[in-house]
Amino acid sequence: MTSEAASKDPISVLSGFGAGTATSASKNGGRTTPSALTPRPRSGFVETEQVRDLTRRGLGFLNAGYPLHFRGPAGTGKTTLALHVAAQLGRPVIIITGDNELGTADLVGSQRGYHYRKVVDQFIHNVTKLEETANQHWTDHRLTTACREGFTLVYDEFTRSRPETHNVLLGVFEERMLFLPAQAREECYIKVHPEFRAIFTSNPQEYAGVHASQDALADRLATIDVDYPDRAMELAVASARTGMAEASAARIIDLVRAFRASGDYQQTPTMRASLMIARVAALEGLDVSVDDPRFVQLCSDALESRIFSGQRAEAVAREQRRAALYALIETYCPSVAKPRARRAGGGARAGVEGALP
């Protein structure tokens, strides 16, 4: 695949992520509704053929009325892609982040406070008529607002919420009806707006704080698997986000991709690691080469922690894996004077080890 630089209208992101404006909360018929986000273009996003393909496939399901689900490991850009696709729909966006403490009331709404009314009638001077009423105040939450107004709902990492929380979604996607709890009083259900769309993301490889998705919900979702971006996309993103020369960014990208391909880690190094190294190197003016001890230290700080999750690893195994990482640095970020000439065991290795504590 070939990559392209950011176009005149680069990828769209949402106001809640550093750009755009938010529509403030409002009261509607005694209800309080949460604010929605307005999509707007953002510079620094590179749209490659891979992104365009995923966007086209996702919009195909959404335009047909199906909820979309982007599934993939950490660092594959699921959330960014979901926000980009949502922006293409041209509707306000409401975002929910999955959480174990999230309940149905957090999606639909609940009674929040009371509205008091007191009338004192003294039309007849020696007779006082007193009338007092107290009504509970209903507050719409994100799902209800999106269904009522026809907004786009982005539910990020939805498997972090308990499965029973999502029972209310089954009727939304199948019957296009949102059933409200009895406390709502005014209405027991609402008809889902025809423009309502939903986009989910999840990480199937995560195991900490994640619940299995219920079959009834998974069966209603159109799932697209998102893999790690190809080299062309990583290179284009790194160059656009950091302003680094493409040749220097390519060295960092190739280093991290080789480290990921080695499998010699406990936490997978993703494109975030490449961007971390490239951004710091660009800001600090480092030479992307094994000749610069500060750059070598930067790579060590960003990548070595992924080899071991704690201090229990045996010293021998630790040193072996560190040596393998340093060999990759020598290979993919070689000396500028003699590119790729110094291999493991040579003078560059001594320079690498001398740069590290």
From Swiss-Prot:
Might you give the EC number(s) for this enzyme?
3.6.4.-
Gene encoding it?
gvpN
Which Gene Ontology CC terms are recorded?
cytoplasm; gas vesicle
Q: Which family does it belong to?
A: Belongs to the CbbQ/NirQ/NorQ/GpvN family.
Q: Where is this region: Disordered?
A: 22-43
This chain's function reads: An ATPase that functions in gas vesicle formation. A minor component of the gas vesicle, also found in soluble extracts. Gas vesicles (GV) are hollow, gas filled proteinaceous nanostructures. During planktonic growth they allow positioning of the organism at a favorable depth for light or nutrient acquisition.
Which organism is the protein's source?
Ancylobacter aquaticus
Binding-site positions, ATP: G72, P73, A74, G75, T76, G77, K78, T79
**Polar residues bias: where?**
22-36
The listed locations are:
Gas vesicle; Cytoplasm
This protein's UniProt keywords = ATP-binding, Cytoplasm, Gas vesicle, Hydrolase, Nucleotide-binding
Name the reaction it catalyses: ATP + H2O = ADP + phosphate + H(+)
Which GO molecular-function terms appear in the entry?
A: ATP binding; ATP hydrolysis activity
Q: How does it assemble?
A: Forms homodimers, probably interacts with other GV proteins including GvpA.
Q: What is this protein called?
A: Gas vesicle ATPase GvpN
Which Pfam families does the entry link to?
A: AAA_5
Share an example GO biological-process annotation for this protein: gas vesicle organization
